[in-house]
A protein has these predicted regions:
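Substrate-binding pocket helix/loop in short-chain dehydrogenase/reductase
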Residues: 1, 5-13, 95, 106
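Active-site loop immediately N-terminal to the catalytic Tyr-X3-Lys motif
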Residues: 2, 49-55, 77-78, 113, ...
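Active-site helix of classical SDR
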Residues: 24, 60, 68
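Alpha-helical segment proximal to the catalytic Tyr-Lys
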Residues: 29, 73-77, 134
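Residue(s) in the substrate-gating loop at a strand-loop-helix junction
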Residues: 44
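Short C-terminal tail/terminal secondary-structure segment
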Residues: 49-52, 126, 137-152
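A conserved structural motif in NAD(P)-dependent oxidoreductases
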Residues: 110-121, 132
Length: 152
């Protein structure tokens, strides 16, 4: 945090929070006219739990969750749901760059004992986009094998 430059902060906030707000606003007019819509934002386990050295990313992803809850309250009466999916560590090119020791340390924090698959995240998004999820709004679905468990 102490070594993070302002431009590093600004770039991550612009990419991971400001862009999401702009995209949400851009789709609202059509959804309001249709009196139907699903907005599903991608946050992260880091936004809920934090991660050393990622103050900017954690703030941006936590901001997306807060923004989504506020928007859900604002437009919920129009049959538009707003939710988040918060992946944990998923088996992608990004996690393939981790060392064996880093993966082993992560797996000790994940009760499921494995990294997630991209399909785990995709299925969660597909569910929230479906008609079966019409009464779910303003929530974050954590897809992380139990690495982070929210209270309540």
């Amino acid at each position: 945090a102490m070594r993070m430059k302002d431009e590093e902060w600004d770039t991550v906030i612009a990419t991971n929070l400001t862009a999401v707000a702009r995209l949400s606003r851009a789709v609202l007019r059509g959804m309001m006219k249709a009196k139907y819509g699903r907005i599903i934002n991608i946050t992260s386990v880091v936004g809920a739990a934090g991660n050393p050295g990622q103050m900017n990313y954690a703030a941006a992803k936590a901001g997306v969750a807060g923004m989504s809850r506020a928007l859900a309250r604002e437009i919920g009466s129009r049959n538009i749901t707003v939710n988040c999916v918060a992946p944990g560590f998923i088996d992608t090119d990004m996690t393939k760059a981790l060392t064996e020791q880093q993966v082993a340390a992560l797996l000790q924090q994940i009760p499921a004992g494995r990294l997630g698959a991209p399909e785990d995240v995709a299925a969660s998004v597909a569910f929230l986009a479906s008609s079966q999820a019409g009464y779910i709004t303003g929530t974050t679905l954590h897809v992380n094998g139990g690495m982070y468990m929210s209270g309540g």
